[in-house]
Amino acid sequence: GVHVEDRGYQFADAVYEVIAVVKGRMVDEELHLKRLDRSLREIRMEMPFTAGIFRLKVAELLRLNRVVNGSLYLQVSRGVSPRNHQIPSAISPSVVMTVRPMIPPSAEMFGRGVAVITVRDIRWRRPDIKSVSLLPNVLAKDDAVRNDVFEAWQVDDGVVTEGTSTNAWIVSNGTLITPPPADAILNGIT
């Protein structure tokens, strides 16, 4: 379980990645690890494992859970320490990984797309850091569900930044439209 004094639980002092797994292999693993490393550095942490150790642990997790096609959730928190806003000087990070089977999108979703609503982007000013602090996303996704649509796209000053749990993509007249890479958004990978 998660310790009650884990800083990820107490302060959302943690970052995460979600990696697709297809035929037992992680999709774009290196890009996800690079983004995780960047997020960690931005919150003044270091990567707690090597890529080799990570691959071994993921292989074991996939085998034990019998997942061939699914998603891997990886969270790294600063670790356990008495509750204090100051970052502790000597602390070991906590790493949590889970896997689950993936339900692929339907052919209709691919063919027709999905309905979305737009909501004001009320997240903090560093969405380029993949922080576990997702309360604005949770509330926006709830708005989408209550409006019987698939997703809520977050809008900041008239610009679509991203969905609550998706990248924002529009195909119009055969042209793919998506927000350009920037610090104001979390750049998508997979």
Describe the predicted segments one by one.
Residues 20, 64, 75:
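Active-site microenvironments in enzyme catalytic cores
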Residues 65-69, 147-148:
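A structural signal for short coil/turn segments at secondary-structure junctions
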